[in-house]
UniProtKB/Swiss-Prot annotation:
This is Natriuretic peptide TsNP. It comes from Tityus serrulatus. InterPro entries: Natr_peptide, Natr_peptide_CS, Natriuretic_peptide_brain. GO terms for cellular component: extracellular region. It is found in: Secreted. Scorpion venom natriuretic peptide that increases the perfusion pressure, glomerular filtration rate and urinary flow in the isolated perfused rat kidney assay. Induces a decrease of the percentages of renal transport for sodium, potassium and chloride and an increase of the urinary cGMP concentration. Also down-regulates the mRNA expression of natriuretic peptide receptor 1 (NPR1) in the kidneys whereas it up-regulates those of NPR2, NPR3 and guanylyl cyclase C (GUCY2C) mRNAs. May exhibit hypotensive and vasodepressor activities. Disulfide bonds join 5-21. One of its GO terms (biological process) is regulation of blood pressure. Expressed by the venom gland. It comes from the Eukaryota. GO terms for molecular function: hormone activity; toxin activity.
C-alpha cells in the first residue's frame, strides 16, 4: 500500500483514503 502524502490508498476495508498525512 501507498502511504504518506503521495496520493490515495485503500485501507484495510477497501475504502479510498485521500492524502494520508
Amino acid at each position: 500500500k501507498l502511504s504518506g502524502c503521495f496520493g490515495f490508498k485503500l485501507d484495510r476495508i477497501g475504502t479510498m483514503s485521500g492524502l494520508g498525512c
